[in-house]
Amino acid sequence: MSIFISIASYQDPLLVSTIFSAYNNATNKDELIFSICDQSDNPMNIEDLAFEKQVRYEHVDPVFSKGPCWARHRAQSFYQGEDYFLQIDSHTQFLPNWDVLFEEALLKIEAEQINDSYFAKPIITSYPRSFKVLDFDKGLFELNTGDKHTQVITYRKDSLFSRGSFSRQIGIPTKYTDITHAYLMAAGCIFTRGRFVEDIPYDPNYYFYGEELSMALRAFTHGFSFFHIPDVPLFHLYTDVSNIPRKLHWDPEDDKNRAIKWNELEKKSLDRLDDLFAENIEGSMGLGSERSLDDYAMISGIDLENKKVLDLQQATESTFLVSIDWKKNPINK
């Protein structure tokens, strides 16, 4: 049950804590493979880790970094056929037994493929619950374990097609306690079979805006299906509430030394998203042929090809996702 854990880190003081939290809280520690693209001023001392042989590590000077998707692409390049793929951010904490919990949930969903091929390639994803840093030096954190309900992802009502094909996403808490279907992905929490890395390789040409939406549509049209689960066994440190300073890729101090500035990368990213939905990108970085954008419109209420909102409630509220029996194909609703 090997798990390939992909982490792209940018100047993040919590990277080491994230690695240890994943390792220490796993039931099958020896089955973990960490793949890390560490964009920082000073590299980690990987040789000091007791599980050094389970870490595939690349250090990149921040001045040479080209953004989060570029870094995630590099982290994926160390994949060597592991059974499962987990992508997280470098400021994440885990519950005990998280590896078994994720696998059991995925297998439960996959079991439904006997009735419908829609369930053959599931992806579990979410915007995880938050955690707080109580004492950074002592490694003390407070995990938001109180709300164990399923949290879903929808489009933000105030940001639909705000920049060409791009619309912002938002996590929405529910009072639901079972698996639900999903139609969007969160880059900071993806758990699926390892073949995802080969079928949907990260496109390094995206920057920040466009990352999650492009990946979701590439995966969906290649036959992958998305699901949310209750009580997701990992937690995320959100920058808007964090008391731990952390640079972002577009930090002026770092960006001033780069040949290509972050705003140029962002523009190219948004243009590429337009090209994706216009089906102007071919090969593994383009859309697949197993499902269409019309199929996606049926499950999401969004017509990406024509930049139209077909059903505002379906696209921006949790009602639709929690109303569908997760064991039924939502495209055939």
List where the protein language model places each region.
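Catalytic cores of eukaryotic secretory-pathway lumenal/extracellular enzymes that build
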Residues: 2-301
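Non-catalytic, C-terminal membrane-associated alpha-helical segments of glycosyltransferases
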Residues: 279-333
